[in-house]
Regions:
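Rieske [2Fe-2S] iron-sulfur-binding domain
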Residues: 1-71
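C-terminal catalytic domain of Rieske-type non-heme iron oxygenases
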Residues: 45-47, 53-207
């Protein structure tokens, strides 16, 4: 099979090294095929469904994927932990208070150090974790999102931080957490940059 050329769908195109006068290459092309999976490239990330083709789900296109004025940049992070631990962190609003605000000092804004009041909401396979903090004269509600099995979004860390009047703020990252083994996982994600208060009509009491 050295040097053989296959098409994206697994069909044999060329079999160099085989006798061109032999029937074997022709038979091989009709009976042998590599496994192949269709992919979707979107905003610098490649998505594949590796189950039975007839069960391929529709690609989920959430509103956060195409926001006017927001620039998305793909990135990858390797974690030396189980993938469930990463999902647990996104659904634990308290971790930002201690990890990013108290034990290691202020990493984002002072508002992160406040524990606040916690609420959790379940909508089918979607979960929301809300942390409502009082920051001086403001009330800041930060929401993190998990859609099973591995899609997460985190509330804004800078554009909306409880230090000024803001009625709406978009997520700071959009991320998929992929298990590698029991002790390692990879996050494939977009960092979201720009005016995260978009759309502006949300930034009013009426909106």
């Amino acid at each position: 099979m050295y040097g053989w050329l296959f098409s994206p769908d697994g069909e044999i195109l060329e079999t160099p090294g085989e006798d061109p006068n032999s029937k074997s290459p022709i038979k091989l092309r009709k009976t042998f095929k590599l496994g192949a999976y269709p992919v979707i490239e979107f905003n610098g990330l490649v998505f594949a469904f590796m189950g039975p083709p007839e069960n391929t789900p529709e690609f989920p296109h959430y509103d956060a994927f195409d926001v006017p004025g927001i620039t998305t940049r793909p990135y990858r992070i390797e974690y030396n932990c189980n993938w469930i631990q990463v999902l647990d962190a996104i659904m634990d609003p308290v971790h930002t208070s201690f990890l990013h605000g108290q034990s290691s000092g202020i990493q984002f804004s002072k508002g992160f150090a406040e524990v606040g009041e916690l609420e959790f909401f379940e909508r089918g396979i979607q979960y929301l974790g809300c942390n409502t903090r009082r920051v001086n004269d403001y009330v800041w509600v930060r929401v993190n999102e998990l859609i099973l099995p591995n899609f997460t979004q985190a509330g804004s860390a800078f554009a909306t931080d409880g230090t000024k009047t803001r009625y709406f703020g978009r997520s700071s990252f959009t991320r998929w957490v992929v298990p590698v083994d029991d002790n390692h996982c990879i996050a494939l994600a977009w960092g979201n940059f720009g005016e995260r208060g978009d759309p502006m009509e949300y930034n009013t009491k009426e909106g």
